[in-house]
Regions:
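Formylglycine-dependent sulfatase
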Residues: 2-253
Length: 253
């Protein structure tokens, strides 16, 4: 005989991870100082959680937990990483994107990565590996660590965007490069004054944690980052709307 069954199209999945967002900073959670109508609509149409627990509330550990399902404190390397830190996810390990990939989803990470790249001695002037592709992502458009750390460049599919071969990028978290200004030594170059050690390499008048040299054509503009990531995410949705997709959309601080 013939057995009939209903088939359900797999839903598209978008995980939006906000950076340094407090529980009471959304108007749907009682804020009177900030108005967040877009997020409030998501809460109205979906589920608003009023009690929850986080295994970690800091950069790298929270991202490690989300992508692996493991407690981040079980991995001693899951701490707030430097911008030149090696990848702390094992290539080929079971991750949220790799599981969805096997289920037929096209997967993407867009935004702040901060899980390390490469094996510890990164050449930023070629494809950096291992990275998102080696742990389940088909597409990546990321900043390596945080907005306040070097390198202040974006990578698409693990290659620095807009980098000139005539001006190679170098990154160090040990020593400054000869002749390069810093927030500590050149405060007259700053439009925003540092705190808590953010007094090293300068990009866009803002001093960062860590040192870098070269790569001038690839440096991001801080004020454009939110729009850039949003536009990339929207384009990814349009290009993949005919098939199920997963986007890990990780906003920077």
């Amino acid at each position: 005989g013939i057995t009939a069954c209903n088939t359900v199209d797999p839903p598209n999945i978008i995980v939006i991870l906000a950076d340094d967002l407090g529980y009471g900073e959304l108007s749907s959670y009682g804020s009177t100082e900030l108005n967040t109508p877009g997020i409030d609509q998501l809460a109205t149409d979906g589920i608003r959680f009023t009690q929850g627990y986080c295994t970690s509330a800091t950069c790298t550990p929270s991202r490690y937990g989300i992508l692996t399902g493991e407690y981040p404190w079980k991995n001693e390397r899951a701490r707030i990483l430097r911008g030149d830190a090696p990848l702390i996810l094992k290539p080929g390990m079971l991750t949220l994107p790799s599981i969805l990939n096997e289920a037929g989803y096209t997967t993407a990470v867009i935004g702040k990565w901060h899980l390390g790249l490469g094996n510890g001695n990164v050449n930023w002037n070629e494809r950096v590996s291992p990275g998102p592709a080696e742990v389940g992502f088909d597409y990546s458009y990321i900043l390596a660590a945080t907005q306040d750390r070097t390198p202040t460049v974006l990578l698409e599919n693990q290659k620095v965007i807009g980098l000139s071969q005539n001006d190679p990028l170098e990154v160090s978290y040990k020593n400054n490069f000869e002749g390069e200004p810093t927030g500590k030594n050149n405060p007259e170059m700053l439009k925003m004054h540092p705190s808590h050690g953010h007094n090293q390499s300068i990009t866009n008048g803002i001093s960062r944690i860590g040192y870098q040299r070269g790569g001038k054509s690839a440096m991001w503009i801080d004020e454009d980052l939110a729009d850039t990531f949003t536009n990339v995410a929207v384009n990814f949705i349009r290009e993949n709307k005919e098939n199920p997709f997963f986007i890990y959309f990780t906003l920077h601080q």
